[in-house]
Amino acid sequence: YGCMEFGTMEDDYRELRIPKIVRWAASLWLQGAIKDTGYEDVESYWMRKDVKALTEDEKNNYSPLYYIEKNLTKENSPDILIWHGDADLDVPYLQSERLNALLTRIVGTDKVEFKLFHNYKHAADQLYSDENLGILKEYLDEKFA
């Protein structure tokens, strides 16, 4: 649901060619909360730290990818389902692609399923369609029933 690598989101947005003004407009609901905090971007606001000033060690301390790489093995991993929308302006889908790549390298493709939804935004209502909930139910029944 959130960022996987703090300090890389700006690079992701540039790679995806999503300008700041578009991201700003998409996150207007959050801008009021950020405005009076002294943080200049959403990522720093969520972290309550200026992510541009973090050292590599500090970034690792906050990175789920770092903990996954350090602690997860094929033997101790649960089955993992990753869904992300390619129109997400809050968390670039490249974050989930890196998560998927790391997980499949560590635990294998049989334990990780990744689906990128076309034109879905962050926490999009379409994720909760009858069709998608049916897919989710089938996945849970298959893996955990």
Cite the ranges covered by each PLM segment:
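Active-site nucleophile loop of the alpha/beta-hydrolase fold
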Residues: 1-6
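Mobile cap/lid helix-loop segments that gate and shape the active-site cleft of serine hydrolases
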Residues: 9-70
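Conserved loop-alpha-helix segment in the C-terminal half of the alpha/beta-hydrolase fold
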Residues: 86, 96-110
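Catalytic histidine neighborhood in serine/cysteine hydrolases
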Residues: 78, 104-123
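Catalytic active-site module of serine/aspartate enzymes centered on a nucleophile-bearing elbow/loop
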Residues: 128-145
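Short beta-strand/loop motif that positions the catalytic acidic residue
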Residues: 75-76, 81-84, 88
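Catalytic histidine-centered segment of alpha/beta-hydrolase-like enzymes
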Residues: 90, 118-131
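Conserved alpha/beta-hydrolase "acid-adjacent" motif
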Residues: 60, 89-98
